């Protein structure tokens, strides 16, 4: 590349973002994450496991066979028999239990027949949600 020094310098900066790999701050963040302490990561993983166990185990205890999720902060649950589409079931969950889930159909045709829960709330709130579903009579 031939030209004014300031233009060449700007082109070099731009080029690093086009075809020479990841943005430098992203690389530095990745290095920090991979070389930093593991305790915060382990603690967060343990918290997601507690939330997953509260949701999936709670639903199984009331008769809804929801498999454990592994490696994700989301749980995919089959729509129980007799509740129509994933969208219809989500509406029933909101109206009858006050619990929000996402219809699987939002993710394309392969998602139909499932609903998705996010493990973003504390265990206490998840336990309350399971109890609300139980009290609603939707399952069983």
What does each model-identified segment do?
Residues 1-140:
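PLP-dependent class I/II
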């Amino acid at each position: 590349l031939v030209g004014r020094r300031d233009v060449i310098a700007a082109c070099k900066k731009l080029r690093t973002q086009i075809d020479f790999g990841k943005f430098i701050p992203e690389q530095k963040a990745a290095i920090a994450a991979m070389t930093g302490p593991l305790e915060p990561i382990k603690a967060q993983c343990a918290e997601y496991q507690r939330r997953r166990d509260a949701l999936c185990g709670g639903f199984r205890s009331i008769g809804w066979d929801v498999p454990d999720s592994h490696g994700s902060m989301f749980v995919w649950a089959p729509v129980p028999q007799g509740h129509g589409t994933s969208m219809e079931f989500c509406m029933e969950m909101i109206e009858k239990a006050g619990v929000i889930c996402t219809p699987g159909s939002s993710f394309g045709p392969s998602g139909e027949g499932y609903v998705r829960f996010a493990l973003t709330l504390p265990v206490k709130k998840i336990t309350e949600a399971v109890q609300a579903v139980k009290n609603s009579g939707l399952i069983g």
